[in-house]
Amino acid sequence: MIQLDKLNHCYTHQGNASHNESLSMSFDLIAKKGDIIALIGPSGAGKSSLLAMIAGFLKPDSGELHLNGELITTQAPANRPLSMLFQEHNLFPHLTVFENIGLGIHPGLKLSRQEKEDIVVAAARVGVNKYLDRLPEQLSGGQKQRVALARCLIRQRPLLLLDEPFSALDPALRKEMLELVKHIAREQKTTVLMITHSPDDALKISNKCAFIHNGKIRVFGPTQQVLGEPKDEVLIQYLGF
């Protein structure tokens, strides 16, 4: 379970010569083990900043973050029990698919026989086991994201953060990747927080949905209820109803 308790951060952006623009963010959220939560909202609302605070890339000004009962607010990003997948796959171009996945286990690729076998299994689960000897430049965009997903999964962390990793893929492939994440998350009982600008994608994969507006979670609940029967006026306007 992940719990955000008044996780706050004030972001100041230098605007024109007359003033600076600021956004005061404050997040409260409880996600149970195995929840897949879609984070929706307008650009600049604070969705990516929320994931950055959870991942440790952005230091909160105050508040607490617990994962499975452990306080991780001050932990270094590398020590946090989570994985994160971005729109950019971040594969190393000079390493093979096998090696890129292996980085999820050991940054120096010092792997045991069992760990090497685990890499093959992870590659098979996401459908790239035929390409283990290839370099990223020899893969399609969808295949690269599958490799990046395998690298996340092999770490076997209880929390997976997705920052629109499939938004650049064509609709059919994006749907396939979302179903893959949903299947694996259920199988491993992984908690997933996923940023998306597509209500349809949220409905396909998530059981809960958080609408973020002006740095706060304005609406939170079951996805079908939040998106199918919206009652909040700001959310209704965002959805275009």
Swiss-Prot record:
Compartments (UniProt record): Cell inner membrane
Alphabetized Pfam families for the sequence: ABC_tran (PF00005)
Known catalytic reactions: thiamine(out) + ATP + H2O = thiamine(in) + ADP + phosphate + H(+)
Coiled-coil portions: none
Keywords associated with the record: ATP-binding, Cell inner membrane, Cell membrane, Membrane, Nucleotide-binding, Translocase, Transport
GO molecular function, one term: ATP hydrolysis activity
Binding site for ATP: 41-48
Record SUPFAM superfamilies: P-loop containing nucleoside triphosphate hydrolases
Domain ABC transporter: residue ranges: 2-239
InterPro entries membership: AAA+_ATPase, ABC_SmlMolc_Importer, ABC_transporter-like_ATP-bd, ABC_transporter-like_CS, P-loop_NTPase, Thiamine_ABC_ThiQ
Membrane topology summary: Peripheral membrane protein
E.C. numbers: 7.6.2.15
Tree of life domain: Bacteria
GO CC field: plasma membrane
Family indicated by similarity: Belongs to the ABC transporter superfamily. Thiamine importer (TC 3.A.1.19.1) family.
Role, per record: Part of the ABC transporter complex ThiBPQ involved in thiamine import. Responsible for energy coupling to the transport system.
Subunit architecture: The complex is composed of two ATP-binding proteins (ThiQ), two transmembrane proteins (ThiP) and a solute-binding protein (ThiB).
Name assigned to this protein: Thiamine import ATP-binding protein ThiQ
